[in-house]
Amino acid sequence: PDMNRPTGLWLGEVFHFADVLYKNGYDIDYISPEGGYTAIDPASLQEDMMSELDWKYYQDKDFMTRLGSTLTPDAVRAEDYDIIYYAGGHGTIWDFKDNKDLQELTRKIYENNGAVSSVCHGAIGLLNVTDSEGNSIINGKTVTGFSNTEEEAVGLADKVPYLTEDELKNRGAHYEKGDNWSQFAVIDGHVITGQNPQSGKAVAEKFLELKNNK
């Protein structure tokens, strides 16, 4: 399958999550599979996709500079983090699934009792993460991610190499979803997942609830 158009990170999925954490005193590092420049899905910059909050961060030169000069997964220490968050965008379908360095970082954070989280197609980053004994960290967990019906609604269900919802189920996860484009996030243990671009804020809020209940 070939999408035949540029893709990459869906910007709003970073902004909405980061905004909640910044307001609660967290520092955030930005990491990508190969470090450096992060490709941005041009569709996420369309006027009808950008909220006032999105424009605020997009026009923040310091923020965008950091996002444009990401770290590599092996350049950071897992013990420094309370959470790892995989933002989505169709580009992650190709970039996240088989990246061993991201998987190793995620495993270490998970086994340190840190939160492992994602939104939308970012859930692909969790598909092949295993614990030290080789068990999938999402097998038996309740999760969500970009739904088949949403993929069909944007006309890309037959253009992508696999569907996020199907792959989560194939890993033994219990998949749940809300209505198309509704804010929907679930937490199971310290795995937190959001369904779509509308759900980044909800993922961050569930992380804060988890931290406050510890």
Residues covered by each model-derived region:
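Catalytic nucleophile serine of serine hydrolases
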Residues: 120
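Extended, subdomain-level signal for the structured scaffold at the beginning of enzyme domains
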Residues: 1-112, 124-214
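Conserved, well-structured core segments that form or line functional sites
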Residues: 116-117
